[in-house]
From Swiss-Prot:
Gene Ontology biological-process annotations: L-tryptophan biosynthetic process
Name assigned to this protein: N-(5'-phosphoribosyl)anthranilate isomerase
CDD domains tied to this protein: PRAI
Cystine pairs: none
GO molecular function (one): phosphoribosylanthranilate isomerase activity
Length: 218
């Protein structure tokens, strides 16, 4: 089994970006979606990117953003990859001259082969849980058996992953990459996720689980 790549999404602080990089993350995600508790400004994102070591991919996440908003971010932040998490059409996704991935929320009637055909120019499909009214970061898993083994695009598995279940997810789905956000965050006093503040120890355990399971191939 090829060792899956790991993206730590929803980075809001320099120290969390460094914790991800130092733990072996292949990519970090920066959220440019105002309603998200993990949203960052272009200035914050630029500072986070400037702190990263070489060869860590920076991913900018947008949800039905305007062209002007996306171009404004690209003018200020050294983004390697775009992630479209809304209802963006393939022509729009293609128009920024950057590699991009398209998120697919797993409603009951989703046909991933159909999405792969429509978004054929994507660098991959990010397959996420569906929760009505929540475009991402749901903390919920979905039935991993719904992911076909024969998709023509690389699969980025997301949705409710955490250190305790990611090894099983990798074994079953055998994705090209995995994406985690809330599953590696600190807990607040109520026991819920902090909404952007990462737990460096959880990041290390998560990445080790992915890399070990990928190498073992079991």
């Amino acid at each position: 089994m090829t060792v899956p790549r790991v993206k730590i999404c929803g980075i809001t602080r320099i120290e969390d970006g460094l914790a991800a990089a130092n733990a072996g993350a292949d990519a970090i995600g920066l959220v440019f979606y105002g309603p998200s508790p993990r949203a960052v400004t272009a200035r914050q994102a630029a500072e986070i990117c400037a702190s990263l070591p070489p060869f860590v991919t920076t991913v900018a996440l947008f949800v039905d953003a305007s062209r002007a908003e996306i171009e404004g971010v690209l003018a200020r932040v050294p983004v390697d990859l775009l992630q479209f998490h809304g209802n963006e059409n393939p022509q729009f996704c293609d128009s920024f001259n950057r590699p991009w991935i398209k998120a697919v929320r797993m409603k009951d009637d989703v046909d991933l082969h159909h999405y792969a055909q429509i978004y054929r120019n994507a660098a991959g499909l990010l397959i996420d849980s569906y929760v009505a009214g929540v475009p991402g970061g749901t903390g919920e898993t979905f039935n991993w058996g719904r992911v076909p083994k024969t998709l023509p695009l690389p699969v980025v598995l997301a949705g409710g992953l955490h250190p305790g279940n990611v090894a099983a997810a990798v074994t079953q789905v055998q994705p090209w990459a995995v994406d985690v956000s809330g599953g590696v965050e600190q807990k607040n006093v109520q026991g819920g996720r902090s909404g952007g503040i990462k737990d460096a120890s959880a990041i290390r355990v998560f990445i080790n689980s992915v890399k070990t399971r990928g190498v073992a191939g079991v």
